Amino acid sequence: MSAEMSSSTRTIYVELLDEGTTVARPTQGEALAGDVYRLLPTPEYDPDDEHWEFPPGSVVRVVKEIRDGEEVLVARELVTTNR
């Protein structure tokens, strides 16, 4: 990953659907503007295995949340899909 790419990406948590409990998958998000990011797939992403609330390529608005004592960014609102 280039230095340019790494400076514009952050870890974003995306809720997984159909898991039977609340689960969030960490992935990378490309910063677009303020609290808006484009979600990138994880290397092992399989849409038949995991159902992300917002699939890779989606442009989402994130919010800061405290999880396990740490502040993280969580995808909460779809801005647009870009598949």
Regions found by a protein language model. Name each.
Residues S2-V23:
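Extended boundary segments
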Residues V23, E65-V79:
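Short, Lys/Arg- and Gly-enriched loop/turn segments at beta-strand edges
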Residues R25-E30:
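Short beta-strand-centered aromatic/proline hotspots
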Residues V36-D46:
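Short, structured beta-strand/loop micro-motifs enriched in basic residues and often containing a Trp
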Residues D49-E53:
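Short, surface-exposed secondary-structure edge patches
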Residues G57-V60:
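Loop/turn positions that initiate beta-strands
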